[in-house]
């Protein structure tokens, strides 16, 4: 029996530190345990928001070029799908003011469509579950596509002697 009550956390901190780490399965679980004990602010955070706009599926076969993105954390008016010649760009931007501060989420995904895609038949659809689908039917054998993702949008520079780009906003 102790002279004064000691809580479980203080008792663990007074024990041998290596034995305490072994109890939590080395450093992997210790990190989770420490974040729960020492950083209560992060405990209440919605960690599903960390991978916003990262889940995507791309299909490029001899029938179609298709992209499917999970954008469930964005409202329809916060999304923009744009086609510049054969360059497909999907952008999402959200700004939210909370009681603890200001949150800004943004993503940009770009793909170069294959040469045999019918650009006039490109179709976009956003369902009720937050899945954005973009399809472009192909006429013949497909070529490899190029993809890139950026965390912020790039500014366009004006270069002389370049023909104007055929820009179409497919979804906004």
From Swiss-Prot:
GO terms for cellular component: cytoplasm; nucleus. The keyword Mitochondrion does not apply. This is Heat shock protein homolog. Residues 47-153 form the sHSP domain. It comes from Nippostrongylus brasiliensis. Keywords: Stress response. One of its GO terms (molecular function) is unfolded protein binding. PROSITE patterns: SHSP.
């Amino acid at each position: 029996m102790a002279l004064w009550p000691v809580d479980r956390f203080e008792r663990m901190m007074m024990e041998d530190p290596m034995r305490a780490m072994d109890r939590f399965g080395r450093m992997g679980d210790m990190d989770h345990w420490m974040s729960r004990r020492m950083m209560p602010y992060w405990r209440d955070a919605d960690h599903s928001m960390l991978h916003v706009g990262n889940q995507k599926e791309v299909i490029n076969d001899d029938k179609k070029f298709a992209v499917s993105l999970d954008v469930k954390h964005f409202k329809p008016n916060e999304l923009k799908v744009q086609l510049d010649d054969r360059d497909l760009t999907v952008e999402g931007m959200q700004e939210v003011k909370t009681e603890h501060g200001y949150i800004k989420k943004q993503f940009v995904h770009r793909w170069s469509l294959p040469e045999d895609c019918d650009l006039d038949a490109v179709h976009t659809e956003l369902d009720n579950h937050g899945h954005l689908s973009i399809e472009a039917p192909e006429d013949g054998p497909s070529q490899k596509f190029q993809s890139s993702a950026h965390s912020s949008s790039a500014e366009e520079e004006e270069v002389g002697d370049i023909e104007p780009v055929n820009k179409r906003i497919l979804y906004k």
